[in-house]
């Protein structure tokens, strides 16, 4: 098990029935415990697996699934029917379950013992039809779940379970997430608006607005010794421009950036996991927060520019899902295109706020003018994103529901150096092509603010959408405009109906 999530756990619940007798049930318990321990030992799984005693009655099932729902440590449940477990016994428990569930369809052994198999073996190893009975009742009750079929010794199986666990972790983080919104939405912008009451009802996230001068007070309460220490950290970590170093003519700008970072950290320490800013509402701040935002994102905080709390929530959620994985996750915005026929690419960036977790090299720390915000020149980290497979994820409020849009991409090196671009950036090739990708994104109403991740897989995002009951449109190598339009029409009907199921 990875060491990053030490407080969270997944419960492993095995179903059977008393009909088999105590000897068989003892074997079921022994083998299911061994299977759970094998999962717990897998490096593919980011969360501890905790075996629970075999359940054989409706009351026992209800008790364990109620306990899972109320446990602050439990972020999800894996279920497995080692033998046949009559599924009517599961109705009350499944109806009470409020945590993500994975139905694992497996068996204890790998091979059939052809030479020795007898009815005792057949009586014990009945997952082939026990899980079918369980699958029926889940579908009959419209239980949202992920289903994984495979032996636990197969790395494909553990990888798939690990992916679901990460989705469950993201959903758990979102259920308790608090976002500090400094100022309001950028004036007249549509897609960054949204229903915060519905967001808290649907996802659990709490979004509240604070005056930017509440932040400014925290910023200007920072002491000089704190700033000195952080400036030294900058010089030890990044390629700091000479003009920003101690004795340089712009060193005061670096100190101001450090002051803003420390003030932000002090403010957010009061239980916040994400935040937003707005260049139209900077109050007494002397710089638009740039370096501070980048470093806070690198530490796992969610961020959205121009009051975009939905993207801020998704940055935090995806970062949680990606903890311990190679790659990174950042706030992002599509900026401009290279439309060279046959090699079309998208250049993504923002005014300042791109997370260095996606950097392909040591970032340089620089100061440059910024034409908006009417403040002093802000300091920022400058770099280009490392190449690799990734996903660009957006969230929008469709009025009747939230919609996630995910485009599978390949992050690539820029075609040439970018000596005059004073901000961090990423260049990517979208699937299946630039034209189909952008047509689909526009048809979906996808936002211009997004999350770029090279850590979290599309499969994990799909599991997250299932867990949270959120629409997800994936744009990948199989997408065509015609089929994508059809999917959106079907989804519109489904989600209107599902809201009442």
UniProtKB/Swiss-Prot annotation:
Its EC number is 5.3.1.4. Disulfide bonds: none annotated. It catalyses: beta-L-arabinopyranose = L-ribulose. PANTHER family: L-ARABINOSE ISOMERASE. Catalyzes the conversion of L-arabinose to L-ribulose. HAMAP family: Arabinose_Isome (MF_00519). This is L-arabinose isomerase. It comes from Mycolicibacterium smegmatis (strain ATCC 700084 / mc(2)155) (Mycobacterium smegmatis). The gene is araA.
């Amino acid at each position: 098990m990875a060491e990053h999530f030490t407080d969270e756990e997944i419960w492993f619940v095995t179903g059977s029935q008393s009909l088999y007798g105590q000897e068989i049930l003892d074997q079921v318990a022994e083998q299911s415990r061994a299977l759970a321990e094998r999962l717990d030992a897998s490096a593919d799984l980011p969360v501890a697996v905790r075996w629970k005693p075999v359940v054989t009655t409706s009351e026992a099932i209800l008790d364990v699934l109620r306990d899972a729902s109320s446990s602050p440590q439990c972020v999800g449940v894996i279920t497995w029917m080692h033998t046949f477990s009559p599924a009517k016994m599961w109705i009350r428990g499944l109806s009470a379950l409020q945590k993500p569930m994975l139905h694992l369809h497996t068996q204890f052994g790998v091979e059939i013992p052809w030479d020795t198999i007898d009815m005792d073996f057949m009586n014990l190893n009945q997952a082939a039809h026990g899980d079918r009975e369980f699958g029926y009742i889940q579908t009959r009750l419209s239980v949202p779940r992920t289903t994984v079929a495979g032996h636990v010794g197969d790395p494909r199986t553990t990888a798939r379970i690990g992916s679901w666990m990460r989705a469950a972790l993201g959903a758990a983080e979102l259920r308790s997430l608090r976002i500090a919104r400094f100022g309001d939405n950028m004036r007249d912008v549509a897609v960054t608006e949204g229903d915060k009451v519905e967001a808290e009802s649907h996802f659990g996230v709490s979004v509240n607005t604070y005056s930017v001068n509440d932040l400014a007070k925290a910023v200007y309460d920072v002491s000089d010794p704190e700033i000195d220490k952080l400036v030294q950290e900058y010089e030890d970590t990044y390629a700091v421009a000479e003009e920003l170093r101690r004795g340089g003519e712009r060193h005061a700008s670096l100190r101001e950036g450090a002051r803003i970072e420390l003030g932000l950290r002090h403010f957010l320490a009061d239980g916040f996991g994400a935040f937003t800013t707005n260049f139209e509402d900077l109050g007494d701040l002397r710089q638009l927060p740039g370096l501070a935002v980048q470093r806070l994102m690198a530490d796992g905080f969610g961020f959205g520019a121009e009051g975009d709390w939905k993207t801020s929530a998704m940055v935090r959620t995806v970062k949680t899902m990606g903890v311990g994985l190679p790659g990174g996750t950042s706030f992002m915005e599509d900026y401009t295109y290279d439309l060279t026929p046959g090699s079309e690419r998208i250049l993504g960036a923002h005014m300042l706020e791109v997370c260095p977790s996606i950097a392909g090299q040591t970032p340089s720390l620089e100061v440059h003018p910024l034409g908006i915000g009417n403040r002093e020149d802000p300091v920022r980290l400058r770099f280009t994103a490392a190449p690799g497979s990734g996903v660009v994820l957006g969230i929008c409020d469709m009025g009747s529901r939230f919609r996630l849009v995910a485009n599978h991409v390949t992050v690539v090196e820029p075609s040439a150096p970018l000596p005059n671009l004073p901000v961090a950036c990423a260049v990517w090739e979208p699937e299946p092509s630039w034209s189909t990708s952008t047509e689909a994104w526009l048809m979906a109403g996808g936002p211009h603010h997004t999350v770029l991740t090279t850590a979290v897989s599309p499969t994990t995002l799909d599991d997250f959408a299932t867990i949270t009951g959120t629409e997800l449109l994936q744009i990948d190598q199989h997408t065509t405009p015609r089929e994508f339009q059809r999917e959106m029409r079907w989804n519109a009907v489904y989600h209107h109906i599902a809201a009442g199921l």
